Amino acid sequence: MLRDKTITSSWYSDEKILKIEKENIFSKSWHLLGSIDQIPNKGDYLIKTINEQPIVVINDIVGGINVFYNVCQHRGCVLLEKDGNSKQIKCGYHGWVYELNGKLKAARGFDKEDLDFEELNLKSIEHYIWMNQIFIKLQSDCNNLPKTLKEIENIISPIKFDNYLFHFRKSYKIKCNWKVYMDNYLEGFHIPLVHPKLNRVIDYKSYSTEIFDNFSLQWCHINAESSPYKKTDDTSKAYYFTLFPNILFNIAPGRLQTNIIEPINASSCNVYFDYYFENEEDLESIQEDISFSEEVQNEDINICERIQIGL
């Protein structure tokens, strides 16, 4: 029998290791930004920092969803500082103005004949939209995301992400390495001890893990009698998908969560929970679901931070 070995604990606290991960993993992976539901109107935009790169995703209606580096082409100043809505993008440093499609509209202090405006448009980022979810990649040599998402789509059918409406985003700053959080998510062995309520909701004996080329799936049946999910019956399942390296889909009856895990430094990370529901009018069920989810998340935060201390 072969003996398994774990990686050295320093990989969970060494800034040099994180630098290697950013250069060789995060820079070469697809990233989830959010949903079209979060920017439904013309001029709505979200800002993100992905692998230390400032990014803006904006709805210009005419051309649809655009994704750019959130950087002025004049002197490199970050353009937009928080999510919002705007008719145009104006740099607060020297006043250069861009249209919502990224084209340079006005360069304060310069005449049009002085500059090649086409060369000074905002730098676009390749993106892919699947069931209203917006993904981007910073480099060309990433895995085949459309193929991966099609596989997931086939597994969860007839469930469709675009039948769920965005409700809100909850952010957590956690004092653990991003891999500690991922390691914890990727195993259900701790559930009976760390998550007593979740253990009553799921059928732990049915808990299974399946490995695919670019993602993994953990799934189990749900106990209808103890479930907080309104649409639960004896055939209901919970699905937990992991898309390498840091995208999670949590699917339960009537509810979808997407999670994004982003390293802050070698010993802390940000985790973003986006909540989606089929029935936005059933506020009582939504609140019950959110309260249950936050209880589970707080249990995970506690155990992950304890692990980080001990590494």
Residue ranges and their predicted role:
Residues T8-S9, E21, G34-S35, D116, ...:
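Short, solvent-exposed coil/turn linker segments
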Residues S13-I50:
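Non-catalytic accessory segments flanking enzyme active sites
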Residues I39-S140, P146-N154:
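Rieske [2Fe-2S] iron-sulfur-binding domain
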